[in-house]
Amino acid sequence: MIDEDRLISGTQKIDENFIDRAIRPKFLADYEGQPQVNKQMEIFIEAARQRNEALDHLLIFGPPGLGKTTLSHIVANELEVNIKTTSGPILEKAGDLAALLTNLEENDVLFIDEIHRLSPVVEEILYPAMEDYQLDIMIGEGPAARSIKLDLPAFTLIGATTRAGSLTSPLRDRFGIVQRLEYYDLKSLTRIVLRSAGHFKLNMSEAGAVEIARRSRGTPRIANRLLRRVRDYAQVKKANVIDDDVAKLALDMLEVDNEGFDYMDRKLLMAILDTFMGGPVGLDNLAAAIGEEKETIEDVLEPYLIQQGFLQRTPRGRIATNRTYLHFGFDKPQ
């Protein structure tokens, strides 16, 4: 099982990029769910604008689907500058990055998604560009090779990552502003669902939006994906209004429960409860019981379950929590 295949994955699917761009907020005033980030960025952006300077380099990190790309475009819009976007895996050679940097204009934004996946050779080029707005380029080969320095316009690098801990210290230390995006609360997600429903010209009740938001795992990308599937259901079933009943029927059909769990989440938790009597159970045994790779369990399934308090990792293995027993209606062994 691959994370991208799951309906409740925060990772963007290939066909979602165009739709996500259309419903993405353009300015901080419309940016929901990250009040501290919003407040701080408003100050930093206004200060840079008043001084007519490039904003300090910005690192945005957090789980997938929370709006890192959205925030980077908002920053560019608020500063009224151009934004060029790329990603770590695409920048294979120093020349790839040099081509982008030399095409930037004064105070422009360069956005690098998955910045933790930059190759070491590209990262080395980035250091003087970030610090001194200079590009060191090697001309020629062998004994005749020489280094020349190119001056770059002042620019803002925005790096986005789901794995801030994987960044090298020299790269991380060069970001003047660091923002962590948190999972969204129910109210914020409900407003996002209603806003997207308006974009799709859907007749949706607030209760219907709440039902979708509740099952969206605190993630706007998942909320918008579930909204599109609920829209399909309502259209085929000829429902005039997407209320909580229609949303429940659609999401139950999709096997997304009221905690946002899908089949694989429930399979893992039920294995711990039923097969291993609540745990503790080792990772090898758990992987064998549910027929999944250990890496998939650790990297894809467990993080959200642990964060929501349904699973605990202990030195002796995984154990189910009180919330898990309540959710599945099991009595906890004494």
Curated annotation (Swiss-Prot):
Question: Could you name the Gene Ontology cellular component terms for this entry?
Answer: cytoplasm; Holliday junction resolvase complex
Q: What is its main location?
A: cytoplasm
Residues reported in the UniProt entry to bind ATP = I23, R24, G65, K68, T69, T70, E131, D132, Y133, R174, Y184, R221
Task: Return the annotated region ranges for Large ATPase domain (RuvB-L).
Answer: 4-184
Q: Which GO terms describe its molecular function?
A: ATP binding; ATP hydrolysis activity; four-way junction DNA binding; four-way junction helicase activity
Record: residues binding DNA? R313, R318
Record flagged with keyword DNA-binding = yes
Swiss-Prot/TrEMBL GO biological process terms: DNA recombination; DNA repair
Q: How does it assemble?
A: Homohexamer. Forms an RuvA(8)-RuvB(12)-Holliday junction (HJ) complex. HJ DNA is sandwiched between 2 RuvA tetramers; dsDNA enters through RuvA and exits via RuvB. An RuvB hexamer assembles on each DNA strand where it exits the tetramer. Each RuvB hexamer is contacted by two RuvA subunits (via domain III) on 2 adjacent RuvB subunits; this complex drives branch migration. In the full resolvosome a probable DNA-RuvA(4)-RuvB(12)-RuvC(2) complex forms which resolves the HJ.
Protein task: The RuvA-RuvB-RuvC complex processes Holliday junction (HJ) DNA during genetic recombination and DNA repair, while the RuvA-RuvB complex plays an important role in the rescue of blocked DNA replication forks via replication fork reversal (RFR). RuvA specifically binds to HJ cruciform DNA, conferring on it an open structure. The RuvB hexamer acts as an ATP-dependent pump, pulling dsDNA into and through the RuvAB complex. RuvB forms 2 homohexamers on either side of HJ DNA bound by 1 or 2 RuvA tetramers; 4 subunits per hexamer contact DNA at a time.
Please report which protein family the annotation says this sequence is part of. Answer: Belongs to the RuvB family.
Q: What is this protein called?
A: Holliday junction branch migration complex subunit RuvB
Species of provenance? Psychromonas ingrahamii (strain DSM 17664 / CCUG 51855 / 37)
